[in-house]
Amino acid sequence: MQIPGHIDPVTTGTVPLRGGNRIDLVGLSRDAIGGVLVEAGLDAKAAKLRAKQIWHWIYHRGVTDFMGMTDIAKAMRPWLTDRFIIGRPTVREAQVSSDGTRKWLLAAADGQEYEMVFIPDADRGTLCVSSQVGCTLNCRFCHTGTMRLVRNLGAGEIVGQVLLARDALGEWPKGNMAGFGAGSDADPEDDDADDDAVGHYTADGRMLTNIVMMGMGEPLYNFDEVKAALKIVMDGDGLALSKRRITLSTSGVVPMMARAGEEIGVNLAVSLHAVSKEIRDEIVPLNRKYGIEELLQACADYPGANNARRITFEYVMLKDKNDRDEDARELVRLIKQYKLPAKVNLIPFNPWPGAPYECSTPERVRAFSNLIFKAGISAPIRTPRGRDIMAACGQLKSAATRPTRAELDRIAEEKQAALG
């Protein structure tokens, strides 16, 4: 079945970050780093040791300059600098919401733009990470869905978002290497060597504790790169984020869901948003390919899902579209029919210019939530975050496809006319 605006599988290739003729090591596995070191002239034994050291400096210490890798001999550091880089995305724009939410517009080495968002809470800090430049799914309530798909992000570009966020939050450890001294060949009298006895964090008060793959793009249509990136993020010798603190969100790419559970093993969130074929076909066109019943069966079969690791159903509240009491009751019925260990996140619709929907009233959202709660299923209402900087759920869209000045002027004129 051909879905308007849908490409299956995604045919756009990834573009690796490069520093001129130098290879960017961010996004490479530990073995792959060893491989490029061998290609550059090191013997296999030396390359394996150097790969371990470099990995630690990149992902545990946040270092971007080989000259700062103080357990590597001084003579080796310029050799590495001449051949490799430790890249970061370019920050085109950084914004901070009145509620503390932060949004970055990032540019890849080829100039393509994408966004990431950090959401601080009292007990956690969540980074919303993008997996593609644009999106192919055309979900009608989503601003990203109005973009064309440009390309997939590479593993390095995905991991780079996490590294950049940790840079911005100032939460890389300082001090010694926390026991990573084995195999060091640094000069013990090296003036550059670290002196601190104990590593510590210098965060600005809100640490990055959770990652959600809910930024731009459909993660399961960039499976291999997302998998590679999350394996790096979860590696215990580096960023060391538990899989229980990572959530992958999909609009319902059914054939890839089991693989995600088996090969990545993170929490699953599903953009459900409707309980009838007619409405979901309209607002999530992928439903025309993988229907609700097929999707819910894939959820029931998702590896590792249980009452301790529930599947999250995301449900955007659209006025007079999917917010009736009957919709809430049908949602409960479906969850119980498929015996799903699930919770429902109710998301007040976040408006954007030209959006075809309005948000349900607060009273309607509360009534919808209460019906689900009374059936024994958790249905919290998500507090909108970052609306004032277009960073809330469904509002992301890169500057490359933002309105032109003429379009902005036209929108302003229309608003003025409406105000009389």
Curated annotation (Swiss-Prot):
Record's cofactor remark: Binds 1 [4Fe-4S] cluster. The cluster is coordinated with 3 cysteines and an exchangeable S-adenosyl-L-methionine.
Catalytic reactions of this protein: adenosine(2503) in 23S rRNA + 2 reduced [2Fe-2S]-[ferredoxin] + 2 S-adenosyl-L-methionine = 2-methyladenosine(2503) in 23S rRNA + 5'-deoxyadenosine + L-methionine + 2 oxidized [2Fe-2S]-[ferredoxin] + S-adenosyl-L-homocysteine; adenosine(37) in tRNA + 2 reduced [2Fe-2S]-[ferredoxin] + 2 S-adenosyl-L-methionine = 2-methyladenosine(37) in tRNA + 5'-deoxyadenosine + L-methionine + 2 oxidized [2Fe-2S]-[ferredoxin] + S-adenosyl-L-homocysteine
GO MF term set: 4 iron, 4 sulfur cluster binding; metal ion binding; rRNA (adenine(2503)-C2-)-methyltransferase activity; rRNA binding; tRNA (adenine(37)-C2)-methyltransferase activity; tRNA binding
Keyword flag 4Fe-4S: yes
Residues that bind S-adenosyl-L-methionine: G217, E218, S249, S271, L272, H273, N350
Active site as annotated: E115, C393
EC number in record: 2.1.1.192
Positions of disulphide bridges: C128-C393
Keyword terms, alphabetized: 4Fe-4S, Cytoplasm, Disulfide bond, Iron, Iron-sulfur, Metal-binding, Methyltransferase, rRNA processing, S-adenosyl-L-methionine, Transferase, tRNA processing
Domain of life: Bacteria
Cofactor(s) listed in the protein's UniProt record: [4Fe-4S] cluster
Residues that bind [4Fe-4S] cluster: C135, C139, C142
Gene3D superfamilies: 1.10.150.530, Aldolase class I
GO biological process: rRNA base methylation; tRNA methylation
Matches recorded under InterPro entries: Aldolase_TIM, Methyltransferase_A, RlmN_N, RNA_MTrfase_RlmN, rRNA_lsu_MTrfase_RlmN/Cfr, rSAM
Subcellular location: Cytoplasm
Function: Specifically methylates position 2 of adenine 2503 in 23S rRNA and position 2 of adenine 37 in tRNAs. m2A2503 modification seems to play a crucial role in the proofreading step occurring at the peptidyl transferase center and thus would serve to optimize ribosomal fidelity.
Family: Belongs to the radical SAM superfamily. RlmN family.
Name by which UniProt lists this protein: Dual-specificity RNA methyltransferase RlmN
Native organism: Sphingopyxis alaskensis (strain DSM 13593 / LMG 18877 / RB2256) (Sphingomonas alaskensis)
